[in-house]
Amino acid sequence: MRILRANLLPAVGLLVCAAAVVAGDKGEKKDPPDKPKVTNPGLEKLKSLAGEWIMESVQEGADAKPEKKTDEQVAIVYKVISAGSVVMEHMFPGTPHEMVTMYHLDGPDLMLTHYCALGNQPRMKAEKSDDPSKLVFKFAGGTNMDPAKDGHMHDLTLTFVDADHIKAEWTYFEDGKKSDVTVFELKRKK
């Protein structure tokens, strides 16, 4: 009988504690406190691009003339994802040259990772710009490449011409130096 009482008393105590916890909880799930939202004017500007964009012209190479596009096909789709913390740029959807660029913050810094059709993933960091209509990104490393020799996108300048027109200038490096610049002029699909 003493053994039963000795084992029963802690078990009853445990049940009382468990009942108190359950009664206090009332089955309500509590969300963790919200993290303070860190924002960046550049990321907010990128969020304004959400939607479909049509290629107006392409210029491949500094000496080339811009090639006007008339097919009105969607070339880029911007989407705000991850509770507003990331902007996804989906380039050339449904084509063999399909690519994705993710714009996000790293602390206060605006970054991008470009998932290139070349199979590498350059990262770039936005620099301070005196021109509020431009976001200028510079190479900050990458994966699946040796930047001293492998071809990769190295810099990007996005110019916000107006609410419905942008220009993207992608700088390509090979063998550790600038090789080419491709310029896309885009308009928002209405």
What are these regions (language model features)?
Residues I3, V21-V22:
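Short hydrophobic transmembrane-like helices used for membrane targeting/insertion
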Residues G24-K190:
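Hydrophobic small-molecule pocket/channel-lining residues, especially in calycin-type beta-barrels
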Residues P10-A19:
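Bacterial N-terminal signal peptides
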